[in-house]
Design a protein with these regions (language model features):
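N-terminal export leaders
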Residues: 7-11
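Alpha-to-beta junction loops
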Residues: 41-42, 78-79, 96-104, 148-149, ...
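A ligand-binding cleft/hinge motif common to bilobed small-molecule-binding domains
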Residues: 89, 106-114, 161-164, 185-218
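Flexible hinge/capping segments at coil-to-helix
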Residues: 132-149
Length: 245
């Protein structure tokens, strides 16, 4: 799927704290200044998650989020520098300042908003079951996952959702997507939970050997994730999103 298609589809307790908050914007450097000084936006993504970010036949990173990140960087007057990182370490890399932002279908959740700032959503999708074609009719609702071997990304919202909603499922976690898809294809697991948009892409890429099973179980919105304390960068990203979409 192309970029064009997807783009459619406290009170403070003391005066000293109050004064501190008022003067902070004057003295605190914002990450946006550093990004513009360096000329690059360090972007974290997996690089193995089609159609959002993956390597083409020549080994070049491509996909919707690659195009989006390049457009965002251009709006900021810099270039995007991509840092492929496994999902289970990508937010830690953001926290440790190895990355400026993460653009990797990071679902905006209340729990994550306690730790990170998010842009407005750039995709709206859902949690989707993906099975082998012959088994598609066996999964129509969340309760159908009970007792089945369900593959999910380690530390993802899919894993959390499954634990909360279908604890009877046999949860198998993966730190990379290719292995997860391969295990489904050869029958080591019964079903995987993925982004609904990614599910349709995978069906196409596998020559319809896999199938989207039922409707999405839950709505999810994804946004650009960045460290808290960078209001100028956050505002610039939000403004760029308005122009891009």
């Amino acid at each position: 799927m192309t970029f064009a298609i997807l783009r459619r589809h406290f009170l403070l307790g003391s005066l000293s704290l109050l004064l501190g908050s008022l003067f902070m914007p004057v003295f605190a450097a914002d990450l946006l200044d550093e990004i513009k000084s360096n000329g690059t936006l360090e972007v974290g993504l997996e690089g193995t998650y089609p159609p959002f970010n993956y390597q083409d036949e020549s080994g070049e990173l491509t996909g919707f989020e690659v195009d989006f990140a390049n457009a965002l960087a251009e709006e900021l007057g810099v270039r995007a520098e991509f840092q492929p990182t496994k999902w289970d370490g990508i937010l830690a890399a953001l926290e440790s300042k190895r990355l400026d932002v993460v653009i990797n279908q990071v679902t905006i959740s209340e729990e994550r908003k306690q730790k990170y700032d998010f842009s407005t959503p750039y995709t709206v999708s859902g949690i989707q079951a993906l099975t082998r074609k012959a088994d598609a009719d066996s999964i129509k609702r969340p309760t159908d996952l009970a007792g089945k071997k369900v593959g999910v990304g380690l530390g993802t919202n899919y894993e959390q959702w499954l634990k909360e909603n279908v604890p009877q499922a046999d949860i198998r976690t993966y730190d990379d997507d290719p292995t997860k898809f391969q295990d489904l294809a050869v029958g080591r697991i019964d079903v995987i939970l993925v982004d609904r948009l990614a599910a349709f892409e995978m069906v196409e890429k596998t020559g319809n050997r896999l199938a989207v099973a039922g409707e999405a179980f839950s709505r999810q919105e994804s946004g650009v994730a960045l460290r808290k304390g960078n209001p100028q960068l956050l505002a610039a990203i939000k403004d760029s999103l308005k122009k891009t979409f």
